[in-house]
């Protein structure tokens, strides 16, 4: 299938049809940058989906963290069930980069733990981009980090079709070059096995499907897709494309050329260090690099091989590394979600990485070429990005400058809900007034969100409200993911009436039951009380038809003035639209997606076990590995029903871990 097809009971409504038309008109007129100013609850994701369907272009959606990326991925997958919706984020559950602290003469080795499920999804994403056009890839900012060359990745692909001739030994050798491992006993992702005239391949982009190649001599007769757990045949395939088990696969000739390049740079660097009278650094660099060269010669790989990536990709010093952007077709479309956060994040990535590696190079731990194993500079990202739509309720200065301040607004909500009423009250005696407002709000059956400036104040306020017998909880940065979701569940169900936080009541926290957002010390100018922060926080009350926001301030700051004026402007537009179309605003309850994932876990594990697993990534990985072994053991004992149950539990845990990462 080459066309995008939305499967949904909803049609564009409110501002959505106009916004979709305007963005598409801008794309058609070759505008490189546009802004979709979408307020909370206006249906930004659904609007993006309709733009994708109508333009029918491969799309990359960038989000500023894994959690937001997972939410968008889940929503897009439900909207486009017949198309390729993929997920591309960092595959590390844990990552400690190598570093050297000169002050204490401490070298920290690289240490990491790779999430197999996310690695699988990364392979599925690059594969889809090379195989088809109806592709949406939802990514975190990790898409600007170095990836294997798309040219080599595609060049080394093995294309299999029934009726063609494939010399057996050559095919097995090709699979090994693709970094597939022969394993006739334990058959898992990234492996192949040989049984008589059959070769079974477990592709790197599947978790529950494998391919069986049936040969007559050297002729490939059939390709069957089968369940690797039960052995049941699922489908007969007309062709199969086997891509590398790593994005860094390369032919032997490339490895040989790289080794020559590394040796040449090593000699130049050693001469330089000697001229600087640095015997320790000279000896250290020579020893470490010679060991890596020996490993590359013998195995084609070495620990930290990514630090030599420039030699494998054929790039010159200082040139940008290949990234996911090079896998995108020329006519691809880019959405940058919550761009007011994502764009500064992209800008910051290069400098932090560079500072750490310069120290390693200076002290003889790495060759200067290691500096080219890096994320894209902001200027490079700016050059590589295709036509872009920046999506935010509060666009940043870069986006506004790129578009000349022109925005496409999504202000009318399909539900008819208005932006909340904003009330400014004196900060003097703010707690006393807050308690009165809390009583009024709770009496209506609504919940209250309170945002403070400091952790100490949040803790003290929570304790004080609890003393007054209010059902109060405190949300802060040290709350683990699972506990955070539990708190949100308790808030929505009424177990908690009041939630106190600092900077956690902004993007992505949608509570329809919230009738009041109280912003304490709103006149203290700064990051937490900037125009952007205030507008985002005000938006938390926009899911409720009776939602109100109280800003406690003794003076009117520029940020308060702009935030309240903008909210009032939007509210008036919404009121006029509702009056014209006879719409009565109504609160719509919506399940928090991550909450649904938590319920899934809860049904499989007891609460204590769930907390233990999700508070400790290492224990979660161990538990998943244990389940895999139990599943394979059950299958080998022909206990397929038990194996299927374990597989379902395993899938639930892996999906939940992805959602909650």
From Swiss-Prot:
SUPFAM superfamilies: C-terminal UvrC-binding domain of UvrB, P-loop containing nucleoside triphosphate hydrolases. It comes from the Bacteria. Residues 25-182 form the Helicase ATP-binding domain. One of its GO terms (biological process) is nucleotide-excision repair. One of its GO terms (molecular function) is excinuclease ABC activity. ATP binds at residues 38-45. Its main location: cytoplasm. GO terms for cellular component: cytoplasm; excinuclease repair complex. InterPro entries: Helicase/UvrB_N, Helicase_ATP-bd, Helicase_C-like, P-loop_NTPase, UVR_dom, UVR_dom_sf, UvrB, UvrB_inter. Keywords: ATP-binding, Cytoplasm, DNA damage, DNA excision, DNA repair, Excision nuclease, Helicase, Hydrolase, Nucleotide-binding, SOS response. The keyword DNA damage applies. Belongs to the UvrB family. The UvrABC repair system catalyzes the recognition and processing of DNA lesions. A damage recognition complex composed of 2 UvrA and 2 UvrB subunits scans DNA for abnormalities. Upon binding of the UvrA(2)B(2) complex to a putative damaged site, the DNA wraps around one UvrB monomer. DNA wrap is dependent on ATP binding by UvrB and probably causes local melting of the DNA helix, facilitating insertion of UvrB beta-hairpin between the DNA strands. Then UvrB probes one DNA strand for the presence of a lesion. Forms a heterotetramer with UvrA during the search for lesions. Interacts with UvrC in an incision complex. The beta-hairpin motif is involved in DNA binding. NCBIfam families: PRK05298.1, uvrb. This is UvrABC system protein B. The gene is uvrB.
């Amino acid at each position: 299938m080459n066309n995008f097809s939305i499967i949904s009971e909803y049609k564009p409504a409110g501002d959505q049809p106009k916004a979709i038309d305007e963005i598409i008109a801008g794309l058609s007129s070759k505008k490189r940058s546009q802004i979709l100013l979408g307020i909370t609850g206006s249906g930004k994701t659904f609007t993006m989906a309709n733009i994708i369907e109508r333009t029918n272009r491969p799309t990359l959606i960038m989000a500023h963290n894994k959690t937001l990326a997972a939410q968008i991925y889940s929503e897009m997958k439900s909207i486009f069930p017949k198309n390729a919706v993929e997920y591309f984020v960092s595959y590390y559950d844990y990552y400690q980069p190598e570093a050297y602290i000169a002050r204490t003469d401490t070298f920290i080795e690289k240490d990491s733990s790779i999430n197999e499920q996310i690695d699988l999804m990364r392979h599925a994403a690059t594969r889809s981009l090379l195989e088809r056009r109806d592709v949406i890839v939802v990514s975190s900012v990790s898409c600007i980090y170095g990836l294997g060359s798309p040219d080599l990745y595609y060049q080394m692909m093995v294309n299999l079709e029934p009726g063609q001739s494939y010399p057996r030994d050559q095919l097995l050798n090709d699979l090994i070059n693709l970094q597939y491992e022969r394993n006739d006993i334990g058959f898992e992702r990234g492996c192949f096995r040989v049984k008589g005239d059959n070769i079974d391949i477990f592709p790197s982009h599947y978790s529950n499907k494998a391919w069986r190649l049936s040969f007559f001599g050297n002729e490939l007769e059939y390709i069957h897709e089968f369940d690797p757990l039960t052995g049941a045949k699922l489908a007969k395939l007309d062709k199969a494309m086997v891509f590398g088990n790593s994005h860094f696969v390369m032919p032997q000739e490339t490895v040989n050329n790289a080794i020559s390049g590394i040796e040449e740079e090593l000699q130049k660097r050693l001469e330089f260090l000697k001229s600087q009278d640095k015997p320790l650094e000279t000896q250290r660099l020579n020893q470490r690099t010679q060991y890596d060269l020996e490993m590359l010669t013998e195995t084609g790989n070495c620990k930290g091989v990514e630090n030599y990536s420039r030699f494998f990709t054929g790039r010159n010093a200082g040139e940008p590394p290949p990234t996911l952007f090079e896998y995108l077709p020329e006519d691809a479309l880019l959405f940058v979600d919550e761009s007011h956060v994502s764009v500064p994040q992209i800008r910051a990535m290069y400098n932090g990485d560079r500072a750490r590696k310069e120290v390693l190079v200076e002290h003889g731990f790495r060759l200067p070429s290691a500096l080219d194993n890096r994320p894209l500079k902001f200027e490079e990202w700016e050059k590589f990005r295709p036509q872009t739509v920046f999506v935010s309720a509060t666009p940043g200065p870069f986006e506004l400058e790129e578009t000349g301040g022109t925005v496409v607004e999504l202000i009318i909500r399909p539900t008819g809900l208005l932006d909340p009423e904003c009330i400014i009250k004196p900060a003097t005696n703010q707690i006393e007034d807050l308690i009165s407002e809390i009583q009024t709000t709770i009496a209506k059956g609504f919940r209250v969100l309170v945002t403070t400036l400091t952790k100490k104040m949040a803790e003290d306020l929570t304790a004080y409200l609890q003393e007054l017998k209010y059902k109060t909880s405190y949300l802060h940065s040290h709350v683990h993911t699972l506990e955070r979701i539990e708190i949100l569940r308790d808030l929505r169900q009424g177990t908690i009436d009041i939630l106190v936080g600092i900077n956690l009541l902004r993007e992505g926290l949608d509570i329809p039951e919230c009738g009041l957002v109280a912003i304490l010390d709103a006149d203290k100018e700064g990051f937490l009380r900037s125009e952007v922060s205030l507008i985002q926080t005000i938006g938390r009350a926009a899911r409720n038809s009776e939602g109100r926001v109280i800003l406690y301030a003794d003076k009117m700051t520029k940020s308060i003035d702009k935030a309240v004026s903008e909210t009032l402007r939007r509210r008036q537009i919404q009121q006029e639209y509702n009056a014209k179309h006879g719409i009565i605003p109504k609160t719509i309850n919506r399940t928090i997606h991550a909450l649904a994932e938590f319920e899934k876990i809860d049904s499989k594990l007891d609460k204590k076990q769930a907390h233990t697993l999700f508070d400790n990534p290492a224990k979660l990985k161990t538990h998943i590995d244990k389940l895999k072994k139990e599943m394979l053991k059950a299958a080998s004992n022909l206990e397929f029903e038990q194996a299927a149950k374990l597989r379902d539990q395993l899938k639930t845990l892996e999906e939940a871990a992805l959602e909650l990462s």
